[in-house]
């Protein structure tokens, strides 16, 4: 169900961007990685999880809520005036 829901969000993003573009309404989606919220750290950040992050994430830092907020602010700003129909991945380079 998770993968299906993600695909639906991507499809909806593209369809709405196409439909609303003539009105200069931009539609994008953000795809966050494993954000270090208090809940994530309390419930799921185990030593094995830490190792997985170290092995799979290109950047050494941990993804913080502020990293996601900065992307949202960019998308809301005039700096992203020509960005639409896109998936903005904020995940520290997860591979």
Q: Residues of each region from the PLM?
A:
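A conserved structural motif in NAD(P)-dependent oxidoreductases
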Residues: 57-68, 79
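Short C-terminal tail/terminal secondary-structure segment
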Residues: 73, 84-95
